[in-house]
């Protein structure tokens, strides 16, 4: 690449800004044609995708990439199938762009309401998983946004092959190629450039490790949609159905250890701890989960001692911290102090207790008699998600199509003048 990284990224940004005006006014039918054509292109390019992915896997193995990272990097036939299905699912979703709500007449005679519109240009920074290229591109396209995708250097060949399929889909729908651009350089300076171009980029979505997200949050001059940690809790109250609670807690932890909605700390009311914990601990041990507990927990079951650091830790592994609490007040206090505002659950049949938990736990998702593993855009009926936000401005929780849009006021009159009867 002869031009500098900054010049290259500026060129991408300028092209994305111009393309955003085209995709922003594209019809739903045209956007869906692009998605369906991209799905067909992926299906036809399976051999090319597998060959490109093999290059990335070989490079990763030669450079000591961890097995978990290699697993996320692999584009298996099943994952290609999943990408194709995902594109078709997004095409089937309702288009939020242009929806108008809350139209009402004011005393002056004007009508005031809100219209949903695209954000503009979305920059997405992610690691390892090449399927994110399709997930992100499809959601941004359907919501009327141009996007710049900066994947990890370990997936560069896979991402280029996927980008070629997206370009075919856009061309078949008569849309400019710059609607979806994949950053072709592996130079890390590209990230710094992307997050500091507010004239071209409207929002950044980082998806990856804590280090990446902290860097983007610290250095960005563009608004960021993100979450740092998924320190999720399940509180089993004194009013819980204990067999139900055991099933919920087990699923919350063991459905998948590596998801951000996995339970990391189990809180148990002191009045039922002696009845609940022995059977619960036995089930976790049978699954191979390492248990750590507070002093009161260790009086009831044989577990390793939990330290202060454990309450702050997102394990993303088969490790669970357990704390016995005096009641609802201590459970809420613990969650709001140690939690990451992601997803937290209560198991209880007491309605006033449930209402307090829902109102007072400061998290983007609050579950009642359901595991935190449900924290997912597909499970919420969004069809897909670009990520999960634990922030409070713009989007909170799983971010789907609507989260990639915003609202503007529309005002309709018939010649009324302010200050005139």
UniProtKB/Swiss-Prot annotation:
Annotated localization: Cytoplasm
Q: Which family does it belong to?
A: Belongs to the gamma-glutamyl phosphate reductase family.
**Principal localization?**
cytoplasm
GO terms for cellular component: cytoplasm
Q: Which Pfam families match?
A: Aldedh (PF00171)
The task this protein performs is described as:
Catalyzes the NADPH-dependent reduction of L-glutamate 5-phosphate into L-glutamate 5-semialdehyde and phosphate. The product spontaneously undergoes cyclization to form 1-pyrroline-5-carboxylate.
Reactions performed catalytically = L-glutamate 5-semialdehyde + phosphate + NADP(+) = L-glutamyl 5-phosphate + NADPH + H(+)
Which pathway does this polypeptide act in? Amino-acid biosynthesis; L-proline biosynthesis; L-glutamate 5-semialdehyde from L-glutamate: step 2/2
**What is the designated name of this protein?**
Gamma-glutamyl phosphate reductase
């Amino acid at each position: 690449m002869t031009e500098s990284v900054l010049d290259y990224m500026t060129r991408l940004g300028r092209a994305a800004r111009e393309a955003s005006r085209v995709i922003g006014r594209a019809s739903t039918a045209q956007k869906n044609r692009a998605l369906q054509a991209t799905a067909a292109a992926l299906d036809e390019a399976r051999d090319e995708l597998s060959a490109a992915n093999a290059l990335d896997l070989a490079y990763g193995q030669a450079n000591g990439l961890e097995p978990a990272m290699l697993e996320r990097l692999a584009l298996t036939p099943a994952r290609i199938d999943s990408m194709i299905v995902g594109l078709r699912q997004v095409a089937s979703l309702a288009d939020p762009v242009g929806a108008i709500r809350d139209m009402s007449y004011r005393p002056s005679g004007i009508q005031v309401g809100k219209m949903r519109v695209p954000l503009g240009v979305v920059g997405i920074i992610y690691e390892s998983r090449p399927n994110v290229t399709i997930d992100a591109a499809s959601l941004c396209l359907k919501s009327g946004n141009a996007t710049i995708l900066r994947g990890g250097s370990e997936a560069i060949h896979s991402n280029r092959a996927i980008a070629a399929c997206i370009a075919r889909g856009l061309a078949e729908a008569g849309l400019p190629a710059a609607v979806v651009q994949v950053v072709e350089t592996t130079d890390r300076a590209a990230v710094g450039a992307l997050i500091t171009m507010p004239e071209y980029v409207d929002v950044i979505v980082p998806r990856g490790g804590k280090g990446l997200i902290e860097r983007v949050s610290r250095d960005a001059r563009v608004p960021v949609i993100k979450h740092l940690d998924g320190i999720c809790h399940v509180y089993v109250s004194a009013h819980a159905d204990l067999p139900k609670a055991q099933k919920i807690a087990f699923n919350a932890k063991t459905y998948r250890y590596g998801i951000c909605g996995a339970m990391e700390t189990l809180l148990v009311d002191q009045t039922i701890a002696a009845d609940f914990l022995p059977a619960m601990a036995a089930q976790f041990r049978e699954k191979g989960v390492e248990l750590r507990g507070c002093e009161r927990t260790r009086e009831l079951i044989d577990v390793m001692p939990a330290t202060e650091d454990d309450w702050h830790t997102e394990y993303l592994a088969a490790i669970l911290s357990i704390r016995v609490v005096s009641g609802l007040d201590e459970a809420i206090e613990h969650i709001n102090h140690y939690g990451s505002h992601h997803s937290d659950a209560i198991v209880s049949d007491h309605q006033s207790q449930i209402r307090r938990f829902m109102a007072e736990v400061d998290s983007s998702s609050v579950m009642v008699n359901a595991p935190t593993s449900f924290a997912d855009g597909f499970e919420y009926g969004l069809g897909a998600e670009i990520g999960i936000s634990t922030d409070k401005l713009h989007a909170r929780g799983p971010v789907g199509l609507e989260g990639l849009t915003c609202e503007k006021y529309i005002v309709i009159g018939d010649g009324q003048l302010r200050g005139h009867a």
